[in-house]
């Protein structure tokens, strides 16, 4: 097709020259004639070995004219340039999604075919991409070759290290177009966007409650199972979720690492600081659909809604009196 008369019988890739097909076949056979003298890693092609050697020498001769970033390989530079141009020339014929790199399209296509040709020899788990298998294997070996130069923390994957580094640099390159919130990771932005869309694709099979995030559903399911795997070493109290344990631990340590830049007030939890800052900004993003009243916090809106629904879930066991808010119940209890 298109003048490529030599086709690989393994994957269907076409080549103009027979010699290139022969070289390509070594990928499938695993043949490695070219060995790195530094680390012993084997390669099927001399050119790939030469490129690999730059990881040891630190040589990065290819520079981006847009931002000045240096690269060891010209192909890596060309891929990087699409960040600046926004070019996405590779389209999925199934769903129309566009990609900057052909490799990303090939990987994406496996989501439609369900193909997972790479298998872990330790546990039998299957993967669509070889890179995912390589990363997964480190869970068995415990290997963490990527070290943060700032704090010394080790990571199994380079991408995890790069994400971690943003904690030190404060870099948040991903911005929500709806509200302007910034995020260090693209996945965090995608999760956040579901707040605006109201999308809740994860449903509890026990009670039907829907969740925006899979992790939230997993945490919720423990309510039904009664599972509380996270224990406080200080007092022995058990928790369903790790985050709940971490929040609880601040009671023992008294730690308040999150400080308001406006008034200096300290908070044990980042979420509480975020809510507090709305006092200074006057932001009230949560609106009552019944009367239009606005609130700074979602919990305040939920409490307010009980006025309209006349819901009174808090009952005093001594006299049977009901209240819509727990603070009102607490005030009443002082009378008795």
Swiss-Prot record:
Localization per record: Nucleus
Coiled-coil region: none
InterPro entries: Znf_C2H2_sf, Znf_C2H2_type
Single GO cellular component term: nucleoplasm
GO terms, molecular function: DNA-binding transcription repressor activity, RNA polymerase II-specific; RNA polymerase II cis-regulatory region sequence-specific DNA binding; zinc ion binding
GO biological process, one term: regulation of cytokine production
Chain's role: May be involved in transcriptional regulation.
Keyword set, alphabetical order: DNA-binding, Metal-binding, Nucleus, Repeat, Transcription, Transcription regulation, Zinc, Zinc-finger
Transmembrane segments: none
Family as reported in the entry's similarity comment: Belongs to the krueppel C2H2-type zinc-finger protein family.
Zn finger region (C2H2-type): 6-28, 34-56, 62-84, 90-112, 118-140, 146-168, 174-196, 202-224, 230-252, 258-280, 286-308
Protein name as it appears in the record: Gastrula zinc finger protein XlCGF57.1
Origin species: Xenopus laevis (African clawed frog)
